[in-house]
Amino acid sequence: MRLVLVRHGESEWNKLNLFTGWTDVDLSEKGVEEAKEGGTYLKKEGFDFDICYTSYLKRAIHTLNYILSQMDREWLPVIKTWKLNERHYGGLQGLNKAETAEKYGEDQVKIWRRSFDIAPPVLEEGDKRCPYLQEQYRGIEKSELPLTESLKDTIARAVPFFEKTIKPQMLEGKRILITAHGNSLRALVKYFENLSDEEIISVNIPTGVPLVYEFDKNFKVLSKRYLGDQEKINAKINAVANQGKKK
C-alpha cells in the first residue's frame, strides 16, 4: 500500500516567519511554484490517486488544487476536514517567530513549536482568532474546537480520523493523497513510524515536497522517500528547523 503526504507550499505567513496555525492565509508566489513542482514530480513518476484529503485551510486546499492541475486530475474527489488542520498556535498566532524568540528565548519558542505535550498560551474567549467565531467552523460544536494545541492534541484529532476514514480505504486498495500542514503531517508520521515523543521533536517536513510511504498489509512502514532534488529538500528541512531562532 502506498500513501503520499504533501505539506502545503510556502504561505504568505511562512515567508514572514509568523506563527500561522489556523489563520487562513494563502500561498506565496514561491508556495504556488512549490505546489506545482510537487505535482510535476508526482506526474513524472507515474503516480495516480483515487481520493484526496485536505484541511479547511486555503493554503492546503490551493496546494492540492495546483498539484491536481499539474497531474490533469482536477476531477478527483476531494474530502476536506478540520481534523487535518494545522496545530492551533493559540495566542502566538500572528506573532513573528524570531521576535518571539528574542522576547521569550529560543528554548521557550522551541518548546512551544516542537515539544510534544506543551501548548502555547490559550486564546481568550471572544478573541477574533477563536475558531468558533469563524465561518468555516460554523457547523462544528464549539466544545470540539481548540483555542490552543500541543502536538499531542493535534495527534488526538488527526490520527483517529486517519484510522477511521483513510486507513480502511487504503486497505480496500484506494490510492490516497493527503495535502495538509507541518504538524498534522508530523502527527501522522509519528503514528506511522511509532516515533517516541522525543524523536518527533526533531522531525521537520519541507513545504510542497511529496513524501511517499509504502506499507505492508499490516501497516508496517516498508519505505519512505521524498520526491525531488534531494539537495533542495535538505535545505528546506533545515530552513524549517531554523524558523524559531533569533535573527
From Swiss-Prot:
The keyword Plastid does not apply. The active site is at residues 8, 86. Substrate binds at residues 7-14, 20-21, 59, 86-89, 97, 113-114, 182-183. Gene3D superfamilies: Phosphoglycerate mutase-like. Its EC number is 5.4.2.11. The record marks 181 as: Transition state stabilizer. Keywords: Gluconeogenesis, Glycolysis, Isomerase. GO terms for biological process: gluconeogenesis; glycolytic process. InterPro entries: His_Pase_superF_clade-1, His_PPase_superfam, PG/BPGM_mutase_AS, Phosphogly_mut1. PROSITE patterns: PG_MUTASE. Pfam families: His_Phos_1. Pathway: Carbohydrate degradation; glycolysis; pyruvate from D-glyceraldehyde 3-phosphate: step 3/5. It catalyses: (2R)-2-phosphoglycerate = (2R)-3-phosphoglycerate. GO terms for molecular function: phosphoglycerate mutase activity. Belongs to the phosphoglycerate mutase family. BPG-dependent PGAM subfamily. Catalyzes the interconversion of 2-phosphoglycerate and 3-phosphoglycerate. This is 2,3-bisphosphoglycerate-dependent phosphoglycerate mutase. It comes from Treponema denticola (strain ATCC 35405 / DSM 14222 / CIP 103919 / JCM 8153 / KCTC 15104).
